[in-house]
Structures are given as structure tokens and as C-alpha cells.
């Protein structure tokens, strides 16, 4: 239904009904709306408008004697056409992410876990963040260190400050190198590789101009190239088959989860192999904005009484992972959308820097 088919008064009353139910989890009547939301019209006028909204499928009465609550259609129209994200909470989310994960000098898992914890804490809902899909790490720093007369340690640090190393054995013809000569050659090789590989993946090895090093370094270069290729095979990108989940306790405090059977179904979904949740979170990677799916729009029975708010975080403008919140359909959508948007934006910047 288009919001243009509603009068301004009906839009205001629908918005007030949604806000009331989100806040209280209780149906609301016309008298309460008139008294609590300053609508400047009589309870009778509000009652008539609520009747119109009910006939339009936007509100319903859970019990004959009760007030009204929003339907899924009412939430959908509210989210799509009446709601504005809470920009103050968006700024607060950005600030907490920047302050609590200040220099980003941590592993990728620590970065994502910290972001998931902050998102859950600020929203009060269940946060879920996937690991990046097919993300190739980039070289941040490379160093060669002589640790014995015949052995060199190759150390590579990636853009998530994770470290891998390989022990290289010098060929027979180099065993008589004096320590200072070997150190000089290792420094030249380290400088060459940092210049050529910094900010690039190890796959860029195939395009390196090794002959430019000169004949003096070619024997070392061959050993080094093999060591780097071995590291590349060992250091594969993290697949997006891992899901970080935070905030379950907060979600289960919501009155919608007071039935043991429903809680058990949700726990089984979260504790399983995640093969059901991941496709849902990673669907439609072309989307460049926050997506809200409500109730029956979700195909999984354990969360069919919930809403899923999700957005992609990107690298080089390509979606690589998902940031999501799961909460009851009676969700504070203004907050959820703002917090998810801020977190996805932060992660995009973090993995790009």
C-alpha cells in the first residue's frame, strides 16, 4: 500500500501506534494515543482513523476488547515510507566503534567480534556478522631476518595484522656469505619486496620483476620466491562460512520469546552449521543499502516472528560480508537501521585501510 493513499492524520496515527507498541508491547486504544502522543484530535476521530487503518490491513485487534497493534503490513509501510533512521544513534555507533576499536591493529576476527558486540549492546538485539567472502589479504609488511649462518626467517604481516612466517634454508653456494654481506642482501630483498608487494596480495608474485635484482641476489631470490609461494598456499582467505553472533541474552528477554519451544528452535538455528542463516544474510549482494525483512518475509520458521535488518560491508565497492540484527517484529527500526548502517560502513573502511 502506498502511503499517499493515507491522509496525513492516518499516517500520524499509524506511526504513533507503531511507536507505542514497540515501546510497551501492549495494544493501544484511541484514548491512550490522544493522551500520550499529543495528536490534537479527539479520541473518537482517532478511533475512526484506526478503523480505516485496520480495514486497510495495517492494524489489527489481537483480542476483541483490546486496542490495536501493527500488522506486518503496517510495519512494512512504516519502515519503507514513514520512518527516518536515528542519526544520533548512528553517530553514537560510529563513535563507539572508533573509540573501542581505535587503531584497527588487530586480527580480522577481533575486529568483527568487537563490532558485533558493540552493535548488540547499542541495539539490544541479536547481532550477526559474517566473515568476508573470498577476501584476499594484502601485504602490509615483509621482513627477512638471518637467524643462523644458513637460515633466514621470512615474516609477512597482512592488512589485518596477522602474521605468517617461513624458515628458508640458504643454498650451498651461499653458505660462505659473511654475516654483514648476508644482512645487506636481505635488506635489499626486503626493501624490494615491500616496495613491490605492499598493499597487494601474494598473488602479485607472478608479476614481480625478479631479474631487476641483479645476478648477485638471484640465488637468494629463487629461495625467497619459493618460500612466498608456500606462504600463499598456506594463507588462504577466510571463507564466509563463519558467523559471529552476539546479544542472544538481550533478545531472549523480549516478551516474544517467553515460550520455551520457540527459544529452543532459535538456539538450534544459531548453534547449527549456519547453512540456513548464511544464505539469508548473504542474499542480494547487489543491494547497496540497509535491507529490512519482516515476519513472514523470512523463510526460516524459528525467526518468522522476527525482523532481520541487514547491510553489506564492502571492499573496493564489492560486497564481501554481511552485518545483521535480528529482533522481534516489534523492533525499534529507527535504531536498528541506523546501527547496522553505521557498523557496515565502519567495517568497509576498516578492511580497506
From Swiss-Prot:
Organism: Synechococcus elongatus (strain ATCC 33912 / PCC 7942 / FACHB-805)
UniProt keyword annotations, A-Z: Repressor, Stress response, Transcription, Transcription regulation
Gene: hrcA
Keyword presence, Repressor: yes
UniProt record similarity statement: Belongs to the HrcA family.
Example of a GO biological process term: negative regulation of DNA-templated transcription
UniProt entry tagged with the keyword Transcription: yes
Cysteine disulfide partners in this protein: none
Stored PANTHER family: HEAT-INDUCIBLE TRANSCRIPTION REPRESSOR HRCA
Name of the featured protein: Heat-inducible transcription repressor HrcA
GO molecular function: DNA binding
Role played: Negative regulator of class I heat shock genes (grpE-dnaK-dnaJ and groELS operons). Prevents heat-shock induction of these operons.
Amino acid at each position: 500500500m502506498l502511503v499517499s493513499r493515507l491522509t496525513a492524520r492516518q499516517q500520524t496515527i499509524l506511526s504513533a501506534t507503531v511507536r507505542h507498541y514497540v515501546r510497551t508491547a501492549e495494544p493501544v486504544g484511541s484514548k491512550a494515543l490522544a493522551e500520550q502522543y499529543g495528536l490534537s484530535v479527539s479520541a473518537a476521530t482517532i478511533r475512526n482513523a484506526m478503523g480505516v487503518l485496520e480495514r486497510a490491513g495495517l492494524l489489527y485487534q489481537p483480542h476483541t476488547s483490546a486496542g490495536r497493534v501493527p500488522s506486518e503490513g503496517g510495519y512494512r509501510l512504516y519502515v519503507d515510507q514513514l520512518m527516518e533512521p536515528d542519526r544520533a544513534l548512528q553517530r553514537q555507533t560510529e563513535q563507539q566503534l572508533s573509540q573501542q576499536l581505535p587503531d584497527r591493529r588487530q586480527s580480522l576476527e577481533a575486529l568483527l567480534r568487537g563490532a558485533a558486540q558493540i552493535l548488540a549492546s547499542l541495539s539490544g538485539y541479536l547481532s550477526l556478522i559474517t566473515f568476508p567472502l573470498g577476501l584476499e589479504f594484502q601485504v602490509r609488511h615483509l621482513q627477512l631476518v638471518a637467524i643462523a649462518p644458513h637460515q633466514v626467517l621470512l615474516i609477512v604481516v597482512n592488512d589485518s595484522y596477522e602474521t605468517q612466517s617461513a624458515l628458508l634454508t640458504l643454498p650451498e653456494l651461499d653458505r660462505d656469505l659473511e654475516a654483514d654481506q648476508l644482512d645487506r642482501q636481505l635488506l635489499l630483498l626486503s626493501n624490494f619486496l615491500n616496495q613491490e608487494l605492499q598493499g597487494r596480495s601474494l598473488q602479485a608474485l607472478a608479476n614481480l620483476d625478479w631479474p631487476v635484482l641483479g645476478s648477485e641476489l638471484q640465488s637468494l631470490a629463487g629461495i625467497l620466491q619459493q618460500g612466498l609461494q608456500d606462504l600463499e598456499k598456506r594463507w588462504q582467505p577466510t571463507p564466509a562460512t563463519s558467523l559471529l553472533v552476539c546479544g542472544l541474552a538481550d533478545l531472549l528477554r523480549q516478551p516474544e520469546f517467553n515460550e520455551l519451544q520457540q527459544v529452543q528452535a532459535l538456539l538450534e538455528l544459531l548453534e547449527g552449521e549456519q547453512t540456513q542463516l548464511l544464505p539469508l544474510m548473504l542474499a542480494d549482494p547487489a543491494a547497496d543499502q540497509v535491507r529490512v525483512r519482516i515476519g513472514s518475509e523470512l523463510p526460516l520458521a524459528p525467526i518468522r516472528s522476527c525482523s532481520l535488518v541487514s547491510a553489506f560491508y564492502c571492499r573496493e565497492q564489492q560486497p564481501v560480508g554481511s552485518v545483521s540484527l535480528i529482533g522481534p517484529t516489534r523492533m525499534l527500526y529507527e535504531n536498528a537501521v541506523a546501527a547496522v548502517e553505521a557498523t557496515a560502513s565502519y567495517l568497509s573502511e576498516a578492511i580497506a585501510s
